[in-house]
Amino acid sequence: MPIKLDNKLPALDVLRSKNVFIMDENRASSQDIRPMEVLILNLMPTKEVTETQLLRLLANTPLQINVEFLYMASHKSKNTHAEHMETFYKTFDEIKDKYYDGLIVTGAPVEQMPFEEVDYWQELTRVFDWSKNHVYSTLHLCWGAQAGLYYKHEVDKVPLSEKLSGIYKQTVDMPENFLMNGFDDSFVSPHSRYTEVTLEDIKNKTDLDVVASGQEVGLSILASKDLREVYSFGHFEYDRDTLAREYRRDLEVGINPDVPANYFPGDDPSQEPKLRWNLAASTFFSNWINYAVYQETPYRLEELEDDFSFYGYL
């Protein structure tokens, strides 16, 4: 959270140069405060697990956040009871006239399919179009990031030679970016995907900043300069055992996967994995809520209706 200081304090400029968020007296006296409204578009098959993972991270912030869940009505969920969906989720038609401070678009196990062949693709593009003037900042995760880049910037995903699965080191490329506040020069997080987007495409087709990347994972975090578009290709939200469950699931269906890298002690799947990304995960989500959403979103969300300036794909 920001700290309030006297406008004339000499340390003010020094602190700002070190990426410390400062609120001067003028802004502090005029700031309106209300709960944040966040919508989660949950595309994962294990919806209740993903709900818990994301809510745990959002709950670490000191802000009051009202959360709603959205699902794609054009897709029938096979892994979640209909009663759960009817009770806790809303369709796009039910929320399309509302406004939100933040939207989280999760990953989905469909990345080896062309985007247009995903059964809910048309509905998803409606959500992307709607979000232009109904959401302040959108956080896209894994396949959700690839889908957003494809639709908004015409950046397609590229197949990897083998699945990227494990805990990987990444480097902070833009320490001055508020999303990286509180991060060390490097951090680790889970990745689990068969595809990637290339730096060449990002440079040629977008004006997004590369916030973090890694030698093994490639691009990790991208963001627009105003943080209204944020793309994360990893899985900060994963629990300690998520990669283990994915590994055993793949074994059961005969995929014969590699053991997730840098995950099990001694690469022994019988051992309990070490949890090494929890602090980075909490910091990233807190930074997104605070700097990309809370500090910049209008008090009256209806004002988003007239603001199209932040989307480079318009």
Swiss-Prot record:
Keywords: Acyltransferase, Amino-acid biosynthesis, Cytoplasm, Methionine biosynthesis, Transferase. The active site is at C142, H235, E237. Its EC number is 2.3.1.31. Substrate binds at K163, S192, R249. GO terms for biological process: L-methionine biosynthetic process from homoserine via O-succinyl-L-homoserine and cystathionine. It catalyses: L-homoserine + acetyl-CoA = O-acetyl-L-homoserine + CoA. InterPro entries: Class_I_gatase-like, HST_MetA, MetA_family. One of its GO terms (cellular component) is cytoplasm. Its main location: cytoplasm. It comes from the Bacteria. The record marks E111 as: Important for acyl-CoA specificity. Gene3D superfamilies: 3.40.50.880. Belongs to the MetA family. This is Homoserine O-acetyltransferase. It comes from Streptococcus thermophilus (strain ATCC BAA-250 / LMG 18311). The gene is metAA.
